[in-house]
Amino acid sequence: MVQLGYFAHVGPGGRGLVDRVLGSGYLLRTLTWTLGENIAFGVGAPSTPRAIMRAWMASTPHRANILAPQFREVGIGVVPGAPGRPSATGATYTTDFGARRLQPVALP
């Protein structure tokens, strides 16, 4: 997002969370799965991890993702900088939440 100058769950090329997660290999051999995502950025003091987490917890949909009992795994990414503000001191955060039920692997 920072490099391409956008801030959204879907990138300029139309790739969304499911596309990105499929590309990571997380869903290989998976029977069922569920995903969620929170994104945020801040400039200056509001860019600290504490400030971002407080903002997410104060937002009903973001808080729901964080506390959702169905999610069992999380991936967290932090990149220096803010989308569309190349000279600003800040950070951009993504948390991807997931749960999956894997296919059993046949033993030889």
Regions found by a protein language model. Give the residues of each.
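Secreted/periplasmic proteins that engage bacterial cell-wall peptidoglycan
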Residues: 1-24
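Composition-driven, intrinsically disordered low-complexity tracts enriched in small residues
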Residues: 106-108
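A well-ordered secondary-structure block
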Residues: 16-102
